């Protein structure tokens, strides 16, 4: 349909090819800061209003489902089961620095959940033990709750009126964090959720702008300023966590696990290769260096703490004789004996 309407045989995974479609339709799109290459994020394509752009997004989803999920699952199936490699923490074999589980051979955490058509079809390939039902249990808004917890227990932030307002809302009922923030900031829920998660994950302004589908830097700045003016505690927590990591060289998760910041870089802004303290001092001088990656401190705090919670729940279940089939981020899936 894209070729029929535009005359372009678009390669759905090639940004330059998609750009030709946008140019033909006279539609604006973002470019990368460094090389000015066309940039099309998943959110940008999915949220776009033009019907042909939505078809490109859908074609991508179908293609990814087939090549990444279905073909991979079939390749690793053995006697009706799949035994993936589980990585506890970052190593040469894979894993994450935050302590969250990751999977390889195959990566079962990539099984789609949100797509209303493909998700149920692919997930239906996984079945419980004989005579049981499939149980799926997850934490409600695990990461936003952790952000509120740390904001409400950090001395320089906890007195902020926006923190008190959200804490009170959680006390009264099970709120939708992203909807509450959107109401406070006067922006849409999808914008609030994108900014929230972007800040939680240490996403830069340029990436956030692309995720939000905003074509100009001015539009993005206006939206960010509106968000931070009315919901300042997220930015304050991000800055305070970064300062702590710079000062102490580590942050501690909810259950006390340490995430270290032991690489250094020159203090001036720019693209630099992080190195050991000894090498950095030798190259730049002791008073002209700073710890690297401290902007990721909030991300490590939140995801590391989420990993603590989920792993503790797995241990608690194991002590009761219950072993999950799979753990996906904040979700545990297991066989439940039918009543």
What are these regions (language model features)?
Residues 333-337:
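Short hydrophobic/aromatic beta-strand micro-patches
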Residues 1-11, 151-172, 226, 230:
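Mixed-charge, glycine-rich, non-catalytic linkers/tails in nucleic-acid processing enzymes
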Residues 174-178, 299, 329:
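Histidine-centered active-site/metal-ligand motif
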Residues 1-118, 127, 131-133, 140-143, ...:
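Conserved "right-hand" nucleotidyltransferase catalytic core of DNA-directed polymerases
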Residues 125-147, 161-197:
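Conserved catalytic alpha/beta cores of large enzymes that bind or transform nucleotide phosphates
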Residues 27-28, 181-323, 338:
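Conserved catalytic core of nucleic-acid polymerases
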Residues 12-13, 172-174, 198-203:
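Short acidic alpha-helix initiation/capping motifs at coil-to-helix transition points
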Residues 19-25, 140-158, 338:
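Short active-site loop/helix that positions an aromatic residue
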């Amino acid at each position: 349909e894209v070729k029929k309407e535009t005359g372009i045989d678009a390669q759905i995974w090639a940004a330059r090819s998609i750009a030709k479609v946008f140019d033909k339709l006279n539609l604006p799109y973002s470019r990368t800061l460094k090389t000015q290459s066309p940039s099309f994020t998943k959110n940008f394509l999915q949220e776009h209003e033009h019907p042909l752009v939505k078809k490109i997004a859908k074609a991508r989803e179908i293609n990814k489902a087939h090549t990444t999920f279905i073909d991979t699952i079939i390749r690793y199936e053995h006697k009706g089961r799949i035994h993936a490699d589980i990585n506890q923490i970052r190593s040469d074999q894979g894993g994450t620095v935050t302590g969250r589980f990751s999977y390889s051979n195959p990566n079962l955490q990539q099984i789609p959940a949100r797509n209303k058509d493909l998700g149920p079809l692919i997930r239906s390939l996984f079945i419980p033990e004989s005579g049981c039902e499939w149980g799926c249990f997850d934490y409600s808004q695990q990461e936003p709750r952790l952000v509120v917890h740390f904001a409400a227990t950090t001395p320089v932030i906890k007195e902020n009126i926006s923190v008190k307002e959200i804490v009170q809302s959680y006390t009264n009922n099970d709120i939708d964090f992203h909807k509450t923030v959107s109401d406070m900031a006067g922006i849409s829920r999808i914008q609030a959720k994108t900014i929230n998660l972007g800040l939680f994950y240490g996403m830069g302004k340029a990436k956030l702008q692309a995720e939000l589908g905003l074509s100009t830097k001015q539009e993005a700045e206006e939206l960010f300023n509106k968000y931070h003016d009315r919901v300042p505690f997220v930015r304050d927590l991000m800055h305070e966590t970064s300062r702590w990591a710079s000062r102490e060289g580590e942050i501690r998760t909810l259950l006390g696990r340490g995430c270290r910041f032991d690489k250094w870089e020159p203090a001036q802004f720019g693209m630099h290769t992080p190195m050991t303290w000894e090498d950095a001092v030798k190259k730049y001088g002791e008073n002209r260096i700073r710890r690297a990656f401290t902007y990721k401190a909030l991300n490590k705090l939140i995801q590391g703490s989420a990993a603590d919670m989920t792993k503790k729940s797995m241990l608690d279940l194991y002590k009761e004789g219950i072993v999950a089939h799979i753990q996906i981020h904040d979700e545990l899936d297991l066989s439940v004996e039918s009543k």
